[in-house]
Amino acid sequence: MAEQIDLKTFKTDVADYEAARPEYPIGITDWITDEFLIDETSIILELGAGTGKFTPRIIASHPKEIIAVDVYPEMLDVLRKKFPNVDCRAGSAMAIPLEDESVDLVLCAQCFHWFANEEAMKEIYRVLKPNGKLGLVWNTRDDTVPWIEKVSKILGRYRKDAPSFVSWKWAELFPGHGFGKLRYCAFPFSRCLTVEELHTLMNSFSFIYKLPEEEKEKVHAELDEIAKTIPRVQNTDQIKLCYQTMAFSSEKEPAK
């Protein structure tokens, strides 16, 4: 069973998070539209919306309304400035500020592992309309690339017991708690960034951000050594970071 999580254990620099975290591949919009049958009547809740990294892909599916909820007001402030037509509300997965059976789809990008517990599942079930859907999305690094695998090992060393996608504990909730089996899709993509931006990306992980400065310096020194071995994109100072976007869907089942 997935464990109860204190959301306040997640802490990072909002500017670093917004600057460094990747966007999502364009193909994910087709997944949203086709998997969840989104049209001009659909109301979508983006739960754990953060600074709005995933929001453009939802907007591109052209629903009737998007409601963005996050526990951190400072992240919502960034989202609100970027997308003023999105209804932003402070709240958590354990206390969603919406009426019963009010949305067609709940989407969680890069965050469900932080609140993968029975209380959150009950709340998600509550706000979904009958036959409503739940979508879970994560950008994951492609560890088949040797240098990316080395970076992931550094992160794994410091992640310890921090909630994460890679633990798969979140998946223990399905099927169950009013939801059916998970369906799965994957979308490969890549992005180019400088070594400096790679350092900023490293800082955006909460368990790195919270390290003592001396320990953090060791992490970045190790990252510099790895960076020396990474091929540059032709005629630039950039490197290519490869990802897989992993997308899961489930449907609300009738109450028993």
From Swiss-Prot:
The name this protein goes by in its record: Uncharacterized methyltransferase-like C25B8.10
| Entry EC no(s) | 2.1.1.-
Which Pfam families does the record match to this protein? Methyltransf_11
Which PANTHER family does this UniProt record tie to the protein? METHYLTRANSF_11 DOMAIN-CONTAINING PROTEIN, METHYLTRANSFERASE TYPE 11 DOMAIN-CONTAINING PROTEIN
Alphabetized, the UniProt keywords read: Cytoplasm, Methyltransferase, Nucleus, Transferase
Q: Name one GO biological process term.
A: methylation
**MF terms per GO, please?**
methyltransferase activity; trans-aconitate 3-methyltransferase activity
Supply the InterPro entries for this chain. Diverse_substrate_MTase (IPR051052), Methyltransf_11 (IPR013216), SAM-dependent_MTases_sf (IPR029063)
**Record keyword DNA repair present:** no
Asked if the Swiss-Prot or TrEMBL record annotates the protein with the keyword tRNA-binding, the reply is no
The entry assigns this protein to a family as follows: Belongs to the methyltransferase superfamily.
Give the UniProt subcellular location, in the record's own words.
Cytoplasm; Nucleus
- Give me the Gene Ontology terms describing cellular component: cytosol; nucleus
